[in-house]
């Protein structure tokens, strides 16, 4: 690979690293807020996504060659809001990454002869697009009162003990372990 020092791609990698690192922290804060509001699954999804953002940051960081580098970039300077507000803010950030920032960074990397880095920006965009969709779907569920209630009978799983309940609404208290509704999620059989 050609020398990265002094290229626009080097700055883009550091910008992406900083953005992913900050997103990771924001998502851990958002996870705490969701848990406090009674959305355990959404809290866990924020935490899972934070871990994925850490891996994106690590991938970008490993391309860098050391030294000092000054970048100028804009980052969200928001607050920790309600779960709904946090989901919407997270989705907006993810959309910006997959639809604008990373495609632009990939193009620049390829123009500068860094095809592998360009490909990595494109592949991480795929993950960011899925993060965006998941956050928007979860926000719609929160906004429409559909986190613990569905339009038809489905299976709900207690995330604490594994008890399965069938109905259009998750039970208020798990009859097996006595944990509140906050610990229920739609049963996924995706194995």
Regions found by a protein language model. Name each.
Residues 1-191:
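Non-heme di-metal
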């Amino acid at each position: 690979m050609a020398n990265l020092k002094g290229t626009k791609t080097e700055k883009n990698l550091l910008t992406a690293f900083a953005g992913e690192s900050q997103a990771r922290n924001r998502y851990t804060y958002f996870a705490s807020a969701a848990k406090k509001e009674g959305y355990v699954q959404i809290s866990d999804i924020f935490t899972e996504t934070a871990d994925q953002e850490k891996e994106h940051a690590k991938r970008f960081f490993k391309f860098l060659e050391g030294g000092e580098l000054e970048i100028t970039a804009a980052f969200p300077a928001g607050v920790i809001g309600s779960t709904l507000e946090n989901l919407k803010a997270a989705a907006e950030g993810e959309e910006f990454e997959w639809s604008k920032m990373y495609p632009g960074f990939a193009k620049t990397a390829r123009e500068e002869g860094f095809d592998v880095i360009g490909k990595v920006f494109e592949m991480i965009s795929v993950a960011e697009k899925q993060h965006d969709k998941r956050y928007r779907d979860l926000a719609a569920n929160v906004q429409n009162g559909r986190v613990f209630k569905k339009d038809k009978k489905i299976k709900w799983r207690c995330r604490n003990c594994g008890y399965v309940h069938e109905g259009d609404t998750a039970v208020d208290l798990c009859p097996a372990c006595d944990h509140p509704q906050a610990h229920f999620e739609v049963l996924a059989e995706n194995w």
